[in-house]
């Protein structure tokens, strides 16, 4: 439908009480264009198509319980019962065009086409009951060669603002008018539950992707992160088909020479915090693609954890939480509207989504050169891994496939020790192909572009959680500064027992006694037994990849004494 026809329909509607809108086309009072959604949409709802941020604020405050404006101008929202992702409820449709590519199993659970269509119809039926719905058109991927067009159709202003921030926004009204048909569409009816008796459902929540239909359907969860990670899953599938490597990583580069660094790590290990460096330009905090020409960000915004946030520790993130930012599930003072980032009474997974423009040192377009350094982040609550280690090529592949971090003991009675978590490629819930495919692509890129690789532990030292202490953020930043300056590469190393890491003997700004972990433990025997316990967990977890692993790759892991 061209612009002239759209304007003609708008003019007719404004001058007559009759509805001359072709079936499936909807007119919004806020925009001058029409938008074709789907033949299944009834046409009764008012459509807000890429509305201004202020409009979404007004809608959330007026119609969504729990919404408020904080003292810094951010919008507080509530995601309902679900305050985090539901990985056990994610499904991928098993269909001929993609079924041979996918790593089926507990990560990628198969769904049949009929179940997907039942959920799709259920979602659209729910959206059709709404007086208003929101449509956000945007892009995933800053490199025009690889970007995809994404359309989000949802019933909450909170979800619309979230995706307005996280997608790459059309530059102007003309670009939006020429957006055309999306490559992928997300139907978010998260307020409405899935039918638990539909074949393949594990609960009333469902997050389903169909690569043939190029659609994603969300039911039974209002947690906005499902949309963001759904797009990452789509890119994790599409990019290797185009010969480029998608990564769950953050990225920044030096202001003066374009020296680029990629940070890998699971949630809570420091990707967002450590990539937001005032002395470097931010490319992105979570999702990137490494191509033959360099790296590009998939997203138009950042999604930062807010627990214990302070301006002193993380000034760039703290100051980004202003008008236009979305704060999820935080607690605030009803009188002053100041947020208490230490209060986790709703959830520990408090989050904020804000556009890249909120970071003063963000680079536009969010594209960088080939990385000079690869940094793998882990939060080792066992207190065994060094604050920094230098990795060889096989160790990079091994630890990338393993994707280790550890969770601290919770509040449950009897739980006193850390729990090891392994997430392949530092993003197992989002990968689609077998992990070795991504690892082989990474090894190829590292070799081709001579990138150095490091493993950094942001977790505990001097003992496990409960005995030792958390490695200070200032020390981690000093390590990263020494990597960027090239100083750390020149410092002699000592090989660590069992794990075989090359550990620098010193680092500017870091106490030398914490660099080799055993030196910080008062109980040396306890250290050795804990190290052997952790090594066994590594060895056991790697067994599921051994059928596709070379002997050199297996040998890159921990080796216990006979």
UniProtKB/Swiss-Prot annotation:
Disulfide bonds: none annotated. Its EC number is 4.1.1.49. Pathway: Carbohydrate biosynthesis; gluconeogenesis. It catalyses: oxaloacetate + ATP = phosphoenolpyruvate + ADP + CO2. One of its GO terms (cellular component) is phagocytic vesicle. GO terms for biological process: gluconeogenesis. It holds the Pfam family PEPCK_ATP. ATP binds at residues 265-272. Keywords: ATP-binding, Decarboxylase, Gluconeogenesis, Lyase, Nucleotide-binding. InterPro entries: PEP_carboxykinase_ATP (IPR001272), PEP_carboxykinase_C (IPR013035), PEP_carboxykinase_N (IPR008210). It is an enzyme of class 4 (lyase). The keyword Transcription regulation does not apply. NCBIfam families: pckA (TIGR00224), PRK09344.1-2 (NF006820), PRK09344.1-3 (NF006821). Belongs to the phosphoenolpyruvate carboxykinase (ATP) family. This is Phosphoenolpyruvate carboxykinase (ATP). It comes from Dictyostelium discoideum.
